[in-house]
Amino acid sequence: MDPNLDQDTLPTHEEIDNDVDSAEEEPPEPPLLPDDIDDDDSHGSRTRRQVKPPPELLRAVGACLISGHYDGGNYFRWQQSIAALYAKAGYAGDIRFHQAAIQEYALDPVLPAPRVSYDLLVAHAGLRYQALLNEQLRTGKTPPADEALKDAVRKAAQAAYDNAVKTGDYTPLIDIAFKGVDINKHASDVAQLAKMSVTMDGTHIKFTAGEMPKDKVITSNSMASPNTVMNILNLITTSANVTAVTCGIEFAIACAHQGSSRYTRHTGTSTGGSTFELIAAHVKEHCTIRQFCSYFAKVVWNHLLTHATPPVNWAKHGFTLDSRYAAFDFFDAVTNAAALPPKNGLIRAPTSEEIRAHNLNAHLLINASRQDDQVSSSAQYTAAIAQAGGFKRPQIGWGE
């Protein structure tokens, strides 16, 4: 078999559908190639051994992943689609071998998720693109925002795929997976994240210039003022490479996952070396944890969306899949004009469903707190409280 693939080598949509449908009933065994057959065939049996497919085939599979050729209604069908492509080209091997080989040339990792969608594949391509730009970002350039990047990569991927179909050359498609789109070409179309660069581990944030906005300052009594925030940040000891602002934002991101109540026990350490517990102690000297975090709410919101990391306890708190990014208790500050503004605004505004879900959750928690007033179950105590018209306690709210 000629290892150089052309357009005729790739299966059509109809052929893939037919192959997949039949594979779901009884997967056909791919044809054996000469190199697949062991020399010892004295008993007339043919045993299969793994042979690594050529780069051209792997690139073709990667191209189909990136371009959305295999959109994938579910993970099983997606697996069978890839297997069908290998069978069409005449190569054997189980799906795990295919995935390991594809990793070398296409998305890293090939998603081990129960559902695989084109948008998710594009998002991973975009994140890989951001990782490759880390060196440039450290020099002061800014990464594209997630939504704009996905849109740009999607358009570039589709254009490259259309061209590959015409020319029969699928090799350039793999560059979409590894390099994404030209940042200079799309720089005017993408948003900056508050003059920040974000590394792939999702924890390290570094301001590259102008750590606090110089524009007109709006203040709110529900969040810390810029002066208060700076006074707190001046107390944070950091390493030479990390600014106090970075540590402060990392603390706010941690609070989005752990909570910003005065009762929260903060775990973890900032990249500057200060523990979040110590930062929390500095914050409490000037304002509440929630007021401090609210100042960085918009930056935290952009960060959660960029890294596709909703607050970890969103399901526990009753949020739905569509409202999960609103599951942190200072979410209401995302729409507050007094919060630290990203340079080009939010990646996206909160949806009405997210706002409703957060407000409902806040209302339920406040009511539960107000009703949780029984310190004794004795008959005398409960009767006395009932006779007095109920226990009167201070009213609390999100501004605590």
Swiss-Prot record:
Residues 1-54 are annotated as: Disordered. Its main location: virion. The keyword Ion transport does not apply. It holds the Pfam family Flexi_CP. The keyword rRNA-binding does not apply. It is found in: Virion. Residues 16-28 have a biased composition (Acidic residues). One of its GO terms (molecular function) is structural molecule activity. Residues 1-10 have a biased composition (Polar residues). It comes from the Viruses. Disulfide bonds: none annotated. One of its GO terms (cellular component) is helical viral capsid. Keywords: Capsid protein, Helical capsid protein, Virion. Belongs to the potexvirus capsid protein family. Required for genome encapsidation. This is Capsid protein. It comes from Botrytis virus X (isolate Botrytis cinerea/New Zealand/Howitt/2006) (BOTV-X). The lineage of its organism: Viruses, Riboviria, Orthornavirae, Kitrinoviricota, Alsuviricetes.
